[in-house]
Structures are given as structure tokens and as C-alpha cells.
């Protein structure tokens, strides 16, 4: 049986529908969903929102997400953590880092 992804004479690997094998970068909605899943799995804090989502030249993503690290009453005293989550072009998490921690009620400039 022939392999549907075969080396072509021009040196590229193409599937019969013309897609290059292994190149299926994820879109914005998928990147946001995967970052949200990563927050739940890795940080164990309630997800609060996504602040930024930027695609890189390599097809990967940089997502800045907020989580509630400590709930308080009133909620303006909640402690919010901003985490940068990096994804490769396939949507796999390649790293995360705490970028900032603040009280919800503080006025913040966006990063």
C-alpha cells in the first residue's frame, strides 16, 4: 500500500490534498482553548481570562492568562496572577511563567 505522505520529487512531503505533512498550525481559538486547559492542569487555580494571544514567527503562540490565586470578599481584593503560556505550532505547552501578581481592584496597564 502506498504511503499517502510520500517524498515528492521536489523534496517536499505533501499529502494528496496538497497539505505539507506535519504543518498544521493551530488557530487562535484552539490556542486559547489549549492555554485554558493548561491553566487548569498546571496551575490548579480558577481561570479568570485571557489578556493577550499572539502568534509567533515559528507558528507557536504566546498567551497571557489570568487566574484567581486567592479569592477574597470583596472580590476587588482577589489576588490575580498573570501567567504567560507558550505553545508550539501544534498546540503543545512548551512553558509557562508567572509574569505578575496583583489585587483585582488595582488599576493595571496592560503588558
UniProtKB/Swiss-Prot annotation:
UniProt keywords, alphabetically: Cytoplasm, Gas vesicle, Plasmid
GO biological process: one example: gas vesicle organization
Chain spans, region Disordered: 1-31
Induction and repression of expression: In PHH4 (a deletion of the p-vac locus) not transcribed in exponential phase, transcribed from stationary to mid-stationary phase. Small amounts of longer transcripts that include gvpC-gvpN-gvpO and further downstream are also seen as well as short transcripts that only hybridize to this gene. Gas vesicles appear earlier when grown in static culture, possibly due to O(2)-limitation.
Location relative to the cell: Gas vesicle; Cytoplasm
Biased composition (Low complexity): 18-31
Cytoplasm recorded as keyword: yes
Cellular compartments per GO CC: cytoplasm; gas vesicle
Domain of life: Archaea
Record keyword Cytoplasm present: yes
Biased composition (Acidic residues): 1-17
Family annotation (InterPro entries): Gas-vesicle_GvpO (IPR008634)
Predominant localisation class: other
Function: A minor component of the gas vesicle (GV), also found in soluble extracts. May play a role in transcription and/or RNA stability and/or in GV assembly. Gas vesicles are hollow, gas filled proteinaceous nanostructures found in several microbial planktonic microorganisms. They allow positioning of halobacteria at the optimal depth for growth in the poorly aerated, shallow brine pools of their habitat. Expression of 2 c-vac DNA fragments containing 2 divergently transcribed regions (gvpE-gvpF-gvpG-gvpH-gvpI-gvpJ-gvpK-gvpL-gvpM and gvpA-gvpC-gvpN-gvpO) allows H.volcanii to produce gas vesicles.
Family indicated by similarity: Belongs to the gas vesicle GvpO family.
Subunit structure: Forms homodimers, forms a GvpN-GvpO heterodimer, interacts with GvpC, GvpF, GvpI and GvpL, might interact with GvpA.
Note in the entry: Encoded in a 14-gene locus called c-vac which produces cylindrical gas vesicles only in the stationary growth phase.
Entry protein name: Gas vesicle protein O2
Gene: gvpO2
Amino acid at each position: 500500500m502506498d504511503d499517502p505522505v510520500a517524498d515528492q520529487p521536489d523534496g517536499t512531503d505533501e499529502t494528496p490534498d496538497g497539505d505539507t505533512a506535519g504543518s498544521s498550525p493551530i488557530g487562535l481559538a484552539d490556542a486559547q482553548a489549549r492555554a485554558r486547559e493548561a491553566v487548569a492542569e498546571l496551575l490548579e487555580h480558577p481561570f479568570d481570562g485571557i489578556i493577550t494571544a499572539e502568534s509567533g514567527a515559528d507558528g507557536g503562540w504566546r498567551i497571557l492568562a489570568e487566574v484567581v490565586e486567592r479569592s477574597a470578599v470583596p472580590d476587588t481584593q482577589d489576588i490575580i496572577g498573570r501567567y504567560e503560556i507558550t505553545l508550539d505550532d501544534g498546540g503543545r505547552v512548551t512553558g509557562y511563567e508567572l509574569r505578575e501578581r496583583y489585587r483585582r481592584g488595582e488599576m493595571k496597564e496592560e503588558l
